[in-house]
Amino acid sequence: MIQEDNAKKYSHAERLHTFIKEVLDKAGVAQEKLDAIAVSKGPGSYTGLRIGVSAAKGLCAALDIPLIAVETLRSLSRKQNLTHNELVAPMLDARRMEVYSAIYDSEGNVIRGTEAQILDETSFTEYLDKSIVHFIGNGVEKFQEVCTHPNARFVTSELPSAAQMAGISNQKFQEGLFEDVAYFEPYYLKDFIAGKPKKK
């Protein structure tokens, strides 16, 4: 498996197609040999999702291949190895004390679907009282500030990665679970709110 990581903010629009070419070159695969393209469907950054999905749809249309969409939180949950009866709660930073989160069991089954929620000391108590819960993602630090439950485990360093999408994408490909390229839209979860323009 080959992937390209980019930690530089606000550079996706300029660099994404270059990254795609670099990954294909490293793998020795021509665009024309691709069977499908997978993309993270959200939730997440409005701009990041829009850029990624637009690029994926454009390539699928040009190459006449199917589009596979993977939930961002589901792919993030694959980064944590669980033992039986443990849960994982992938968590992405929204604004202030808000996060996007979901809960999965050790088999990858959805225990609670994706929600936007305001965090406080009682968040996730119904799950923490019964199981060890691994909180993972860039929204974890917010919850770590208010959660003192002994069953909470915090993994703050992990971000969504294309590598974790591979297994899910392959399964969807085998099952023929494709999106309509013309009409597919990212799962923003919340309406876009414009911020102040960045200073140049």
Regions found by a protein language model. Give the residues of each.
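Stable alpha-helical structural segments in soluble proteins, enriched in small hydrophobic residues
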Residues: 23-27, 62, 80, 162-173
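Surface "functional belts" at beta-alpha junctions
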Residues: 11, 66-160, 188, 193-194
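DPxDG-like acidic metal-binding loop motif
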Residues: 36-67, 72
